[in-house]
Regions:
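Accessory regions of macromolecular translocation/handling assemblies
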Residues: 1-424
Length: 424
């Protein structure tokens, strides 16, 4: 054995100094992740210039995902510190004013006015210093955002990002998806991408109701419903584009056929699993098809027999777009939809609803669990999303295709061509 006799030759290069390589000479090990980019050195006293991908992760996509969530948290905490400082300054001013008014000597004459003026000056000074710190932090985050945004891959990028003009159908499953942008009133031009992990863990509800926000109330009902359906179509197109060919299918329920215009990018490209379903019969057929799929996959998973699924069962991810819910839905269809919302995501069936909750008020509280199970977003700006760190109300805006751009149609044409080639 080692240490007995001189029959074993030393490894080339080893001369008894330095660390010993204990790796097996013929056993391959997984390569460590490439190190994240390092920021160039900064001048003394200055923050280091930001670098895209400056976070932990095994891939560039994961590092960018973690970096964006880090920016999200940094912005939330910076604004929380500023708001806390302003609240403290105003609270202290109120206390000083109360003390000044409670002293009879200060109620009359110039002494009281001087005490009140000093209290207000101190409040303004504290507020100004807090704002100076906030502006410094926001400037650093804006500089980081300016570096990160151009480096984002297609699943994370806005529709105005040049990455979409060089789009190619991916070969690997995506990690996350951009649902829209978030901002706070302290600096509305600093937008944080809202990224969600894939596959989706819960369905999405695009609220087409006019009572949701001031922006919604100021938008006409027909216009708001069209914007909501446009948002659903661009989200479905993004999902189709970021998955490999034929790994993601989109189904549509449009009971009255009211969304034909908004659905044109999907129908014209031929990327839907079937034509949009309309009428009670169409609604029933689509729900029965997807319910059967969820049932079969659940049974196969529980039995540990995934290989026993019927050969006609598509094992990819599925998205069901439902327009104008609950129109066209009877009690049985509503029950099936709730089942898909609850049990579908775990087995690859996801729900994207375009609905006004007021339209479903006749169903009463029976639909409350359905609404709660869905991630609510809006077709216009609305401050209804809350962060998990300090509880700010963030204004959400969906990803929109730039006016006059054909990028959506171009991307869907490439998706359709890849699906046809993969089916041969």
């Amino acid at each position: 054995g080692p240490g007995r006799g001189g029959g074993r030759q030393r490894r080339s290069g080893y001369r008894g100094r330095g660390p010993i390589d204990y790796a097996h000479p013929r056993r391959q090990t997984s390569a460590p992740p490439p190190p994240p980019p390092t920021a160039p050195s900064a001048a003394p006293g200055q923050p280091a210039p930001p670098v895209a991908g400056d976070a932990t992760g095994w891939s560039m996509d994961e590092r960018l995902y973690n970096q964006i969530w880090g920016m999200f948290e940094d912005l939330a905490r910076a604004v929380a510190a500023y708001r806390s400082a302003v609240d403290f300054a105003e609270s202290r001013m109120e206390q000083e004013l109360d003390r000044a008014l409670s002293d009879p000597r200060h109620r009359m004459g110039g002494a009281g006015d001087l005490a009140r003026e000093r209290a207000r000056d101190r409040c303004q000074d504290l507020t100004a210093r807090a704002r100076e710190v906030l502006d410094r932090d926001l400037s650093q985050l804006a500089a980081e955002s300016a570096v990160v945004e151009p480096a984002l891959p297609a699943p994370y990028a806005g529709w105005d990002n040049p990455v979409w003009h060089g789009y190619r159908v991916p070969m690997e499953l995506p990690m996350a998806l951009r649902l829209g942008d978030l901002h706070l009133p302290e600096r509305t031009d600093l937008r944080i991408p809202l990224l969600v992990r894939l596959p989706l863990e819960r369905g999405v509800w695009i609220d087409s109701g006019r009572t949701a926000s001031e922006a919604a109330a100021a938008t006409g009902g027909d216009r708001l419903r069209r914007l909501a359906m446009d948002t659903a179509v661009t989200l479905a197109a993004r999902l189709l584009a970021v998955y490999p060919a034929n790994e993601f299918s989109v189904h549509v329920i449009d009971p009255a056929g009211a969304a034909a215009g908004a659905l044109a990018p999907l129908t014209d490209a031929g990327v839907l699993a079937a034509p949009p379903a309309s009428g009670a019969g169409g609604v029933s057929a689509v729900l029965a098809h997807l319910t059967r799929r969820v049932d079969l996959v659940q049974m196969a998973v529980r039995a540990g027999a995934a290989d026993s699924l019927p050969p006609d069962l598509d094992t990819g991810e599925h998205l069901l777009i439902v327009n104008d819910f609950p129109h066209g839905f009877d009690d049985r269809a509503v029950t099936q939809l709730r089942y898909l919302a609850d049990d579908g995501p775990a087995v690859g069936v996801h729900l994207l609803m375009v609905a006004d909750r007021e339209d479903a008020r006749d169903h009463g509280p029976v639909l409350d669990p359905l609404w709660r199970s869905l991630l609510r977003v809006t077709p216009v700006a609305d401050d209804h999303l809350v962060d998990p760190w300090v509880g700010h109300a963030w204004t959400y805006e969906p990803c929109r295709v730039p006016e006059g751009s054909r990028v959506l149609e171009q991307v869907l044409a490439l998706v359709a061509a890849a699906r046809r080639a993969d089916s041969r």
